[in-house]
């Protein structure tokens, strides 16, 4: 039996993974050659590598495919990549859709491994490329900051409720205030570590400084977007980037019925969350290209929040453009019809929020309600490159 492609899948769990070795024949049939379970550990990885080597044909393309299951796939993917294997990592929703297309009614690890191997044999997919250790650490820190900020917001809400309840528990209030102080200290420590991580890489530091010349875009925003996109390494167009972030528009039309269009939100939620406050700032601080977009959409009767989401998307593409071109913000270049203005630049330091001291009193738009405790960008705190 001649075959033209080899596909090995790994359906990964916390402690073990199910593997399936399949081949695509010259008649374009997918045939399973072997299956086995391995421990999700260095010893299991070594056994898996030997198992694959015994069965593969070195003259035929081989791909190892796995699902992005939390963090559990990372060690195996990294080990195989270091060994020179072609690794493909697919999102869970894509894998699920493919399994459904095969007509499988049951679900278990063995069947999932077979379906993944079938997918790897049938389809041509982009190989997985790990991000640099610097960006990997930066992503960990920015996500930790987001989580601690959310916990801080929850504590503030609980403290507010407790202080206004009929029978106030003084000991509860005291504990909540201590917890709030702890979260605030943690946020400051994480912010300093983010700055130190960026400063440790001169090239990364220089490029992030250029990105933060956009008024309203601070260090935390830039760091989060750069880390979540792996420095835009895998993107060749703005369309790819906006789709990855979930800003692509989904139509809802059938026959004569025309439903509302909306963004898919099937993308990286960390990017969308971090861009919320910068979009408000960019409009209120009159960044011309953002302010013009906001006014054009609201002038057409669009809801204000819809316009702000459009500004978020615009900011993301601007950051992408500045990063790829390795240049700072130039107002007349990106909106020539607007008069030249005095664009904020970062000299000795970069503001966490992207808002200068002179502009802090104008950050909150008159049309927006105060939501300072609901977002991971605390306006007013400074985080500088040292």
Residue ranges and their predicted role:
Residues 1-386:
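A detector of single, family-specific signature residues
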């Amino acid at each position: 039996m001649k075959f033209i492609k080899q596909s090995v899948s790994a359906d990964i769990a916390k402690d073990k993974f199910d593997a399936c070795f399949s081949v695509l024949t010259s008649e374009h049939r997918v045939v399973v050659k072997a299956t086995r379970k391995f421990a999700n550990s260095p010893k299991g990885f070594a056994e898996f590598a030997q198992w694959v080597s015994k069965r593969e044909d070195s003259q035929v393309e081989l791909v190892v495919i796995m699902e992005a299951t939390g963090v559990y796939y990372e060690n195996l993917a990294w080990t195989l990549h270091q060994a020179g294997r072609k690794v493909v990592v697919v999102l869970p929703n894509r894998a699920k859709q493919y399994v459904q297309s095969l007509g499988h009614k049951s679900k278990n690890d063995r069947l999932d491994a077979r379906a993944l191997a079938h997918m790897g044999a049938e389809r041509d997919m982009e190989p997985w490329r790990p991000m640099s250790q610097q960006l990997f650490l930066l992503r960990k820190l920015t996500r930790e900051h987001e989580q601690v900020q959310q916990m801080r917001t929850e504590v503030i809400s609980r403290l507010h409720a407790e202080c206004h309840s009929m029978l106030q528990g003084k000991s509860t209030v005291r504990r909540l205030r201590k917890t709030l102080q702890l979260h605030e200290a943690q946020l400051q420590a994480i912010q300093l570590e983010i700055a130190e991580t960026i400063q440790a890489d001169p090239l990364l530091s220089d490029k992030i400084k250029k990105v933060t010349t956009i008024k309203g875009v601070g260090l935390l925003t830039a760091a989060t977007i750069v880390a979540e996109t792996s420095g835009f390494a895998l993107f060749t167009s703005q369309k790819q980037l906006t789709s990855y972030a979930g800003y692509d528009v989904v139509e809802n039309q059938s026959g004569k019925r025309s439903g509302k269009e909306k963004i898919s939100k099937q993308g990286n939620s960390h990017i969308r969350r971090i861009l919320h406050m910068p979009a408000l700032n960019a409009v209120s601080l009159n960044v011309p290209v953002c302010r013009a977009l906001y006014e054009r959409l609201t002038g057409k009767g669009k809801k204000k929040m819809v316009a702000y989401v459009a500004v978020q998307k615009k900011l993301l593409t601007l950051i992408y453009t500045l990063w790829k071109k390795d240049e700072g913000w130039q107002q007349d270049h990106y909106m020539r019809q607007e008069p030249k203005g005095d664009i904020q630049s970062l000299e000795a330091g970069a503001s966490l929020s992207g808002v200068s001291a002179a502009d802090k009193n104008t950050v909150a738009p008159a049309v927006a309600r105060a939501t300072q405790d609901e977002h991971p960008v605390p306006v007013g705190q400074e985080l500088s490159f040292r």
